[in-house]
Amino acid sequence: MKPQELFKRMTHHDVKPTRLPREAVRPPAVASILQVRKGGWLKAGLLSAVMLAALVPAPPVMAQGRLDAQYEASLAGILVGRGAWRIDITEDQYAAAAQGGSSGIMKAFSGGSGSGSAAGKVVNGQLQPSGYTATTSTSRKSETIRITLAGGVIKDSSITPEPPPDNDRIPITEAHRRGVVDPMTGSMMRVSGTGDLMSAEVCRTATAIFDGRMRYDLKFDFKRMENVKAEKGYRGPALVCAVYFTPISGYIADRAAIKYLMAQRDMEVWLVPIPGTRVLVPFKMKIPTPLGNAVLEATQFVAAATPRAASKGP
């Protein structure tokens, strides 16, 4: 089965779309958090509706795994959004999809909808993305980002409708388009070897992401262990990793939000494993903003190993 077919089958489950402010519904990764425009820090805070994570080399995935998760986003303790994330990992391919919606007070101020997806192959244990799409809509406009990749190289990317040229953005070079992953794939941390998935060393890594607009690096470091508990599903230990952001290109250097996030030393992500794999994903994330902490946390986190396909006889 092709990755695109896997994604299509995966998203035919009963996950109801909801509405979320355009800036809050981009798929998982810090890149979306950094795309702060004229809406200022309120939009930056709402971007807690997306995930953080890292990407590191890994051995072959030893089994198949699946995640069905529901998240709530808050800003300064006030509920602003809800979202869903689904991941399927088989022995030779993977697919992931996310969607979200505004809740509580945010419905009175801003409405929108958004979804994102990524698919690719599992090659030597590494998730190699082949395609990524993110669509966001509000009452005023809609936007779709598409990225095509092969072997960690961006082969094509587009934003529809095409944004006007901005000479203030640092140009993205061909070198910046190599050795990267898309934001959705970048939300899954792969752990090499056969050792403990929940060791401090797992946090000590870095990754390079291109989100269609911006190329940036994320560096992670170990902070502590905590126990977490979802209303449904996972309860157990989580790795809490510090997250440090370095923009590379595709950004406006004098933007206040970019400078703020570059200086941040208190961004954190809580990582937990998907059974049957050596993949960890975010259970919770926290991003300080001048309006208070932007927090995304799982309320449902149902992850399980899935059976291998039966081997065919001779």
Short names for language-model regions:
Residues 50-51, 61:
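Cleavable N-terminal signal peptides
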Residues 1-3:
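Positively charged n-region of N-terminal signal peptides that target proteins for export
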Residues 137, 141-183:
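Internal, conserved structured core segments that host functional sites
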Residues 63-151, 196-314:
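Acidic, serine/threonine-rich low-complexity disordered tracts
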Residues 5-6, 13-18, 23-48:
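Bacterial N-terminal signal peptides that target proteins for export
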Residues 179-196:
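A structural motif
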